[in-house]
């Protein structure tokens, strides 16, 4: 029962302050420019935060340059970017809030079970935004849209950690 109460609160929280249609469009437009750069996005995260790389047994202790061009790296990068793409596709439509909550809850649960901390999620966020701001069409409105959307998503994640 407690789970359903927390889930309901997360959905209400996301709905209470959803991104606007213009913000959703800005998020989608900027994401469209980088969503096929899966390997580069994950490499940027690992380069910025080696502690995150260390959380992946198949990549821990290895030089980033030696793993970046491997199939295992590309596959995992595709999973991460694919998740973000799913969320980006759903953002901006309040009727999608339950679907977003389900995806985010699954991510939260699996990462909680692996001992991933709020700090590491925030590190990931920082690297993602840094990558976006330097590789996508970016302005103040786009930055505000991503901040708003990520605040909603990370609020939901942190409610489950």
UniProtKB/Swiss-Prot annotation:
- Which residues of the sequence carry a binding annotation for heme b? 76, 111
PROSITE patterns (UniProt xref): GLOBIN (PS01033)
At the top level, the lineage of the source is Eukaryota
Naming one, the record's GO cellular component terms include: extracellular region
Q: Return the Pfam families for the record.
A: Globin (PF00042)
Q: State the signal peptide span.
A: 1-16
Domain Globin: where? 18-161
Q: Name one GO molecular function term.
A: metal ion binding
Task: Give the UniProt keywords, A-Z.
Answer: Heme, Iron, Metal-binding, Oxygen transport, Signal, Transport
Could you describe the subunit structure of this protein? Answer: Homodimer.
Query: Per the similarity annotation, which family is this?
Result: Belongs to the globin family.
Further notes on this entry? Answer: There are at least 12 different components in Midge globin.
> What is this protein's name?
Globin CTT-IX
């Amino acid at each position: 029962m407690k789970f359903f109460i927390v889930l309901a609160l997360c959905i209400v929280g996301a709905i209470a302050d959803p991104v606007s249609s213009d913000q959703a469009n800005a998020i989608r437009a900027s994401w469209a420019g980088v969503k096929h750069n899966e390997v580069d996005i994950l490499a940027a995260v690992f380069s910025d935060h080696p502690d995150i790389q260390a959380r992946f047994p198949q990549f821990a202790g290895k030089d980033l340059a030696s793993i970046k061009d491997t199939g295992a790296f590309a596959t995992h990068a595709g999973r991460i970017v694919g998740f973000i793409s799913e969320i980006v596709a759903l953002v901006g439509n309040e009727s999608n809030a339950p679907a977003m909550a389900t995806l985010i809850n699954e991510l939260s649960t699996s990462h909680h079970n692996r001992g991933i901390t709020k700090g590491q999620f925030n590190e990931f966020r920082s690297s993602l935004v840094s990558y976006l701001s330097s590789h996508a069409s970016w302005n103040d409105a786009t930055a505000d849209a991503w901040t708003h959307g990520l605040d909603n998503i990370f609020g939901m994640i942190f409610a489950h950690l």
